[in-house]
Amino acid sequence: MRMNYFVVGTNDMETSVKFYGALFEHSGLTQVRPSERMTYWLRDDFAFAAALPFDGEKATNGNGTMVGFSVGSAEEVTRLYKTALELGGTCEGEPSQRGPRFSAYVRDPDRNKLCFAD
């Protein structure tokens, strides 16, 4: 079994598309098939999406829920961390060595928690 895709909820699709579009710009993920309710970014082996909730209720971030991205290097961790903050994300943990991995933590504008690790 392997991870196929991950979807984060949003209450503002325009802000999410701007945030993730810029964040993923150099990552190999390509934006495809945007609709009024959901926008996907794809790579050969993975998909990520931002979506307005199907039930029409307000999107909320999960307490204890986090999306982790393996990005290949400490430099890329730091670049993505800084980019996320420039795009309106907030810091949840500055780039540093944590155990065997160099990582950083941010929240997107909807407060979904993301981790970037080398």
Residue ranges and their predicted role:
Residues 4, 35-37, 91, 102:
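Residue-level marker for the onset of beta-strands and adjacent loop->beta junctions
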Residues 48-54:
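Conserved, structured core segments of small domains
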Residues 40, 56-59:
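Short secondary-structure boundary/capping segments
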Residues 7-48:
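Core segments of cupin and vicinal oxygen chelate
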Residues 3-11, 27, 59-118:
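Vicinal oxygen chelate
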Residues 1-3, 118:
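Absolute protein N-terminus
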